[in-house]
Amino acid sequence: TPNMSDEQKQRIRMHYKRSFLDYDPRQGMSELIQDGINRNPDMKPIKKNSRISLKDTQIGTLTNQITFVSKAIMRLTKLQALFFANSPFTQDAIATGWADENSEYAKQYMNEDLSWSKMESLTDVELYNCPNMTRLPEFIFDLPDLQLLNIACNRGIKPDDILTDWQKLADDEDTGPKIQILYMGYNNLEAFPPHESLKKMVKLGLLDCIHNNIKTLNPFGTEVKLSDLKLDYNQIEVIPDDFCAFTDQVEGLGFSHNELKYIPNIFNAKSVYVMGSVDFSYNKIGSEGKNINCPMSEFKGINASTITLSNNQIGTFPTELFASDSPISTIDLSNNRMTSIPKNSLKPKDGNYKNTYMLTTIDLRFNKLTSLSDDFRATTLPYLSNMDVSFNCFSKFPTQPLNSSQLQAFGIRHQRDAEGNRILREWPTGITSCPSLIQLQIGSNDIRKVTEKLTPQLWILDIADNPNISIDVTSVCSYIEAGMYVLIYDKTQDIRGCDALDIER
C-alpha cells in the first residue's frame, strides 16, 4: 500500500501481537470472579482469548515453495514492508543473485547500483517460520531504517547463532538505535546479549521472547523504556533490578512459566502511571521461604492494577506488595501453599497502607487456608467485590469479607481437611442481609440444615453436592419459576417449597 498512514502501519505491526501474544491473565481466575468482573460496569471486561488456534499453520509447516528471492527486489526502492513466512529458502538465497543471469531483465539492470542501504522506506521485515534458515540474512543489517523485525519460529537457528545475530543487530549503528519492535518467540534463544549491546537499542518498545530456552537475562538498563515485554515460557531464574524501564503505555507484561524464585524488583509502585497487568504465574516464587530477595525498605512494589501470582509456591501472603503501596485492584493467588493469612498481612498495626483500599478482587482458591484475619474487613478493603476461597480447608465460614458493602460474589466451594473429609457444615447465617451480595457458591461441602429465609437479592446460589443439606426455598420459588433466580442444586437433595425444581422424593 503506497503512502500508508501511521495508523495503518501500526495496525499491521500489531497483528502478530494481537494474534499470538495478547491475553488477559484474569482468564485464569475462577468463573465466579470472571462473572463478577464482567457484571461490573466499572471494571474492564475480561476478553476471550484471541490466540491463534491449532487449525492455523504450525511451526515448521510450509505454505509455499519459495527457495530463491531475486536481487531484483532491491529495485523496489519505495518498498515499506517485506514479509516472508512459512518458506523453505535459506538465508543465502535472499537477493544474492538474479533468478536468471542470462535473462534480458538481468542484463538490463546488471550494472545498476543495487543496495539494501538505499531502501530507506523499508521499515518492517518479517522472516517468520523459515525452518531452513540457520542465521539471519545479511541484508537485515544493511537496512538504514529498520523499525520492526519479526524472526519468530525460526528453530533452524542454533542458540549461539541467534544470540550472535541479536548482538550484531544491537551493535550495528543502522539497526541497533532504530528497532522499535522485535518479535523473537518460538526460537532457540538461551541468553540475552551483554548489557553493552542491549543499551544501544534505545527505541525498542516491544520485545517478544516467549517459548525460548532463556536462562540468563542481561539488562538493557533504565534508559531503554519498554511498553510491552513478553518473556513467558522460558527458564528464567532472575530478572536484574536494572533490567529496563517502562513507558506510560504498558498494558500487560508476561513472565509466566519460568523459574523465578522471587518477585522481581524492576517496577516502581510510586509511578504516576499504572500498568494493566503483570503475570508471574507458574514460577517458583516462595520456594526459598520468602517472596522478595531484598530488604522490605528496598522493594519498590509494582505499579499495576492486576497482578497474577497463581501456581507458585507462596506460603506467606505477599504483604510486600501492599506495604510498598502497589495500586493493586485484582490479585490472583490461587494454587499456592498458604495455610493462613494472619493479622497485619494487608495492613500495618496502625492505620492502613496507602493503596490497599483499591483492592476489589481476590482469588485464593487451591491453597490450604483454614482462616482469614480481620484484615479482610471493610475497614481495610472497603471496595472488595469479588472473592473466591474455594478448594481450601475452612471448617468455619470466614465472615470477615461479608461486611463489605460492595461484596457481590463470594465462593467457598469444596472445603476439605488433609484426609479429604468435608469439613464445612454450617450455613453462614445472616448472609442474605449482605447489601450487595448477588452470588454465593457454597457447593461441594457438607452444609446441613439451613434455617435462614432466602431473598431474591442473593439470586445466584450454588448448593450442589451438599448431600446432607436441608433447605426451604419457598420465599424465592416465584423467582425460580420466573427464571429470575439461579439455583444450582442436585435433584436428590432435601430442598422444599418449590415444585418447579422437580426434586426426587
What residue spans do the PLM features occupy?
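Consensus "Asn ladder" position of solenoid repeat domains
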Residues: 57, 64, 87, 130, ...
